Curated annotation (Swiss-Prot):
Chief location: cytoplasm
InterPro entries: AmpR_PBP2 (IPR037420), LysR_subst-bd (IPR005119), Tscrpt_reg_HTH_LysR (IPR000847), WH-like_DNA-bd_sf (IPR036388), WH_DNA-bd_sf (IPR036390)
CDD domains: PBP2_LTTR_beta_lactamase
Keyword set includes Cell membrane: no
GO molecular function: DNA-binding transcription factor activity; sequence-specific DNA binding
PROSITE patterns xref list: HTH_LYSR (PS50931)
Gene coding for it: ampR
Compartment(s): Cytoplasm
DNA-binding region location: 23-42
Protein name: HTH-type transcriptional activator AmpR
Amino acid sequence: MDRPDLPLNALRVFEVAMRQGSFTKAAIELRVTQAAVSHQVARLEDLLGTALFLRTSQGLIPTDEGRLLFPVLEHGFDAMSRVLDRLGGRRDIEVLKVGVNTTFAMCWLMPRLEAFRQAHPQIDLRISTNNNRVEILREGLDMAIRFGTGGWTGHDAIPLAEAPMAPLCAPGLASRLLHPSDLGQVTLLRSYRSAEWPGWFEAAGVPCPPVTGPVFDSSVALAELATSGAGVALLPISMFESYIAQGRLAQPFGVTVSVGRYYLAWPSDRPATSAMSTFSRWLTGQSAE
């Protein structure tokens, strides 16, 4: 039967989206926007005349057709990559696998990745995102960017971006918040770190009201919900400067609290490779700017 001419890029985007389990994580791996991933998958579905994913409130669910297509593409792209590496003489390319906190990846690292690739083409950087603490050894990684206070047993770590936290919300809601005590009248969105809001209210000198809003394991998810006016989120300001600059979020109060910062970590007993050293120097340089 006649088959449509399927664009290789759309097939590749679908393969990555299936493997990562979300358009957001696929966008990080491919270094494009989430909208670009969604567009390419929709284009492929249109050409094939069938849905490859079900879009639900719980995320992406592959259809039977998507599950049928994925292993064929995964094997094909893997085989193609191996052959191209041999033909292109990529023996000097050094793979570096880095696990990254999702918020840091999307809000800080992604806008800078192309500059790193241009400056260091000899490093094949492979990013894996995680909303919780990245486990380097268990996940087969070389390094990880974590949020916390440092001092992880068996690991060396260097500090990166600071992350003072403050309440952020939609500008319309911010205009109605005149005093920190007013936060007791609105929904307080929260992360799984339950001490954050009480710590901020202590810094503000105001009793902490009941914090009963929905819990999220991602600051990006909290920020997106806050932009809709659904409540106030306690977020690391340095990660969401673009949201504030674009008028999507506003900071109603100047009080901040620090519960940790971002670190680059690696196992203490692992000798640093050239790629690890290069990436470490680049990250610390970018953080200092």
